[in-house]
Amino acid sequence: MQHSSFIKRTFLGVVALTIVLGLLIWGIGPNVIKARQVDLLYLGQQHLILVFNSMALALLVGIPGGILLSRPCARRWAEYAMQIFNVGNTLPPLAVLALAMVFIGIGDKPAIIALFLASLLPIVRNTYSGLCGVPASLIEAANGIGMTKGQRLRQVELPNAWPVMLSGIRIATAINVGTAPLAFLIGASSYGELIFPGIYLNDFPTLILGATATALVALLLDIALAGLGRVLSPHTAE
């Protein structure tokens, strides 16, 4: 049942994507897309570079951070620590970009730092929540068969927390992809190079092209992550 439900949702997603692409081509015209084909490919590559680099940093910091905070000795400090990890979401994205530009300069590096901060909280919080939500009976069973703390974490806690962790990663990725166009304002290449000139010049087709490309990247990455969840946890991933 779960397998057929997943196939049905995937099919409906592909149909919806096809309809959106058809409406896009009809609305702005194939000539605009053809004229911007090189820009779409190049800016898409640059957009993904920003997303992948910043998400890699967020995963390297967020997952260990969530694991550490989920340990019994650290749980009382968890909510205080979450406020620190939340700095990228508390401040407006433009303010984070501006601060990063002041300290680091312009280009990809400040953009990656700002996107890293914006993506951090969902990963930390969902890792923490997923690990704290592992049934106590499983923990007791692992202890009962003589597992060490490391073995228990790797073989019991993380596999059971994975669906919740993946949900946080998907949320963080969507935030990251949607925020990345703002990096254009501090000299980093992304689909913002289509969106913001489209706004300034009242060039509606270029604006829609950049916004739609950004939305499609977010959708495709989310589908890929959902598929990864099905592979790694076929009985629980959604």
Question: Which residues are covered by each model-predicted region?
Answer:
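Loop-to-helix entry region at the N-terminal start of transmembrane alpha-helices
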Residues: 10, 42-50, 54, 101-122, ...
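Glycine-rich helix-loop "coupling/hinge" segments at transmembrane-helix boundaries
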Residues: 102-103, 179-214, 233, 238
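Faces of alpha-helical transmembrane segments in polytopic inner-membrane proteins
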Residues: 61, 65, 85-93, 113-128, ...
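Short cytoplasmic-facing helical segments at TM-TM junctions of multi-pass membrane proteins
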Residues: 126-168, 191, 195, 238
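Transmembrane alpha-helices
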Residues: 117, 149-183, 209, 213-214, ...
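Periplasmic/extracellular loop-to-transmembrane helix junction in inner-membrane transport proteins
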Residues: 2-3, 19-56
